[in-house]
Amino acid sequence: MQQQKIKRFLAHFVLDHVTIEYLKYGHQLTIEQLKLLIFILHFTENHKEDLSLNMIIFYKNYQKNQLLKSITHLYEFNWISKKRHPYDQRRLVITLTQNQCSKITQLIEELEHFLEVKSTLIKEINHSTLLSYYLKCHSQFRVIEQSCTSQHLTLKELYLLGLLIISDNKTTFKSIKVHALKGIIAMGPIIKTLQSKGYLIKSRSRDDERYIVLTLRKEKINVIQSEIEECYNKLEQGIQHV
């Protein structure tokens, strides 16, 4: 059962990071900006009144400075339009043109297709609520990240340790790099940190000295398994009601 939870944790971690990169480089968006766009689209479709910044803050609990930065970014990339309220020039009103509505809808459809392709290893996902599932998953990872584990391990460190666990506690640096989400996670610094924390041993292969072998310290294996299982349980609790 622990092995299954570790594999699920790794699959969710990968899904989160590749989606962040997809939005960042494919659409110049963060996850928070995506969530804001979805909210603006749904509000525009379901309400006749103008959408002000104060209404967004009320409904979505944004910090005003953070919201202004996101609104400015979305406006500059033509995701949204903005204007001054006709009866109060101090108030900023957010609107969407028909083309912008279509653009956001297309983004959502493309993202759902991307998630469907990238989530084949996650059997728990109901594909009718795929985007909602992912957004809950992303939010829950941020909660876990901020709360810190009892062993003070980061999610990236747990990801690498989890890869070693499912590789029978020992593998080469070359094999690990295959799963390193190239360009997203720099494995070298993480390995050095885990060495200094006493979780793994780095050595040369006896069969071929060109290869670097990474081995988990035996006394740390149960601790690592418990940490990852605890993180997965927290993740599961946060997304189970989607």
Regions inferred by a protein language model and the residue ranges of each:
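Short, cationic-aromatic polyanion-contact patches
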Residues: 32, 85-108, 172, 205-228
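Canonical helix-turn-helix DNA-binding module
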Residues: 50-82, 88-91, 170-211
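N-terminal helix-turn-helix DNA-binding core of bacterial DNA-binding proteins
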Residues: 20-62, 145-183
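Glycine-rich loops and low-complexity Gly/Arg-rich segments
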Residues: 61-64, 106-108, 118-122, 185-187, ...
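Intrinsic low-complexity repeat tracts in disordered regions, enriched in small/polar residues
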Residues: 12-18, 40, 74, 100, ...
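Generic structural signal for well-ordered, non-membrane alpha-helices
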Residues: 35-38, 69-72, 135, 139, ...
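N-terminal leader segment of winged-helix/HTH proteins
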Residues: 1-27, 78-79, 93-98, 102-148, ...
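C-terminal regulatory/effector modules of DNA-binding transcriptional regulators
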Residues: 22, 35, 188-242
